């Protein structure tokens, strides 16, 4: 599935709004990923699949020296431009993540962030190889995706199914698809690329999610919706 078709039109607008204060993106995934990032002061960061720019503004606020955002959805990139404004330390690229990141040089980023995008792609291994290439030796990759257990509970079948499934976004009526994967597949592809695992977390929603949607907040306390990892490129 081409990422350029994933969040266009009304779906892109819905996602941009929901990611601002929704229980899952804003109050489950993002706090966990930013905690995994630690101190980003002075770092050059790649946000692959930057969406509406929420991570970009957070990373800049936390001291990142420069952030490069790459996004396949033109609609989401418009939202990102509006959110980022005229920050000279931010560069945005409209680019399909199914394709190589040929416009980015080798060993040029301290930190890569891939938040809830990698499960939409068919060329996952190719993207991971590109991320490994553009990170500096000793650089860090943060990656989050849908938790395999949540997929099994929501979509049924076998835990080991790795088919494409369709998901509905809240009460909006909007739908999208992504590919399920087991934990073995998820971690195996990262390790096969040459990354070393430093930390894995299964985020629970923060208390702020209760204010937004208590029912969905409580769901995250029973079922792990996402899994997030901190990986390291060998310093060589």
For each predicted feature, which ranges?
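Class I SAM-dependent methyltransferase SAM/SAH-binding core
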Residues: 46-48, 52-100
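Short alpha-helix
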Residues: 177-200
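Conserved class I S-adenosyl-L-methionine
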Residues: 1-40, 54, 58, 76-79, 140-168
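A short glycine-rich, Lys/Arg-flanked "PGG" loop and its adjoining helix->strand segment in the class I
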Residues: 125-137
């Amino acid at each position: 599935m081409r990422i350029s078709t994933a969040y266009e039109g009304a779906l892109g607008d819905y996602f941009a709004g929901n990611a601002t204060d929704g229980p899952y993106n804003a109050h489950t995934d993002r706090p966990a990923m930013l905690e995994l990032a630690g101190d980003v002061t002075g770092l050059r960061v790649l946000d692959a699949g930057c969406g509406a720019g929420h991570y970009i503004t957070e990373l800049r606020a936390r001291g990142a020296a420069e952030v490069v955002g790459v996004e396949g959805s033109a609609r989401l990139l418009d939202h990102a431009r509006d959110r980022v404004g005229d920050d000279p330390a931010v560069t945005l690229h409209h680019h399909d993540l199914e394709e190589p990141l040929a416009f980015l040089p080798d060993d040029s980023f301290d930190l890569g962030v891939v938040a809830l995008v990698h499960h939409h792609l068919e060329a996952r291994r190719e993207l991971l190889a590109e991320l490994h290439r553009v990170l500096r030796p000793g650089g860090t990759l943060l990656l989050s995706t849908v938790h395999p257990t949540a997929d099994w509970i929501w979509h049924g079948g076998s835990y080991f199914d790795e088919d494409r499934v369709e998901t509905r976004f809240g009460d909006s009526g909007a739908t999208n698809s992504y590919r399920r994967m087991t934990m073995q597949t998820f971690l195996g592809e990262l390790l096969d690329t040459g990354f070393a695992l430093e930390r894995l977390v299964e985020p629970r929603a923060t208390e702020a999610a209760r204010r937004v949607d208590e029912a969905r907040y409580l769901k995250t306390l029973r079922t792990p919706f996402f899994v997030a990892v901190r990986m390291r490129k060998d310093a060589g």
